[in-house]
């Protein structure tokens, strides 16, 4: 008896946009992180809204009030679902993430390789924590893999950060 895995080839994001009104002022380092995260996310991801059937999907991310908004649509623009998630579980993680990112960007200009590596390990650890939190918050709503969660967390951080 064989168990077949679901075909996830169409369960993916093909386009992602960020609500421009939600984006805080940011420097070139943050803009670079955002561009890389969007590119990497569209290139490879697993994104399967529960009960929506096969994709592909587009995703618009924004902040409305104190909530994170995931506006999910089909590739042709037809609405699928909008999820609103509380930002509370992300506030401390995003704050810590940007504090360590600031240290990292300063360190790569002046610090020793060992110090840069130590800061980068801390940065990755906080990023992983945010990614796991996002997976937990989306559980039962949208199935995503860890790498997709990492890229989405980067984008959430850009929205959440108010410089």
Swiss-Prot record:
<comment type="similarity">
    <text>Belongs to the UPF0262 family.</text>
</comment>
<dbReference type="InterPro" id="IPR008321">
    <property type="entry name" value="UCP032146"/>
</dbReference>
<protein>
    <recommendedName>
        <fullName>UPF0262 protein RPD_4278</fullName>
    </recommendedName>
</protein>
<dbReference type="Pfam" id="PF06793">
    <property type="entry name" value="UPF0262"/>
</dbReference>
């Amino acid at each position: 008896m064989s168990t077949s895995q679901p075909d996830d080839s169409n369960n993916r994001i093909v386009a992602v946009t960020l609500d421009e009104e939600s984006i805080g002022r940011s420097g070139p380092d943050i803009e670079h992180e955002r561009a890389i995260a969007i590119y990497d996310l569209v290139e490879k991801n697993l994104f399967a809204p529960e009960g929506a059937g096969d994709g592909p999907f587009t995703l618009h991310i924004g902040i409305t009030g104190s909530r994170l908004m995931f506006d999910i649509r089909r590739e042709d623009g037809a609405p699928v679902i909008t999820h609103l998630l509380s930002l509370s579980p992300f506030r401390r993680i995003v704050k810590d993430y940007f504090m360590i990112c600031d240290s990292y960007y300063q360190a790569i200009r002046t610090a020793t390789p060992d110090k840069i590596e130590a800061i980068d390990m801390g940065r990755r650890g906080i990023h992983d924590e945010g990614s796991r939190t996002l997976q937990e918050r989306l559980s039962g709503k949208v199935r995503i893999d860890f790498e997709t969660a990492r890229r989405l967390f980067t984008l959430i951080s850009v929205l959440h950060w108010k410089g």
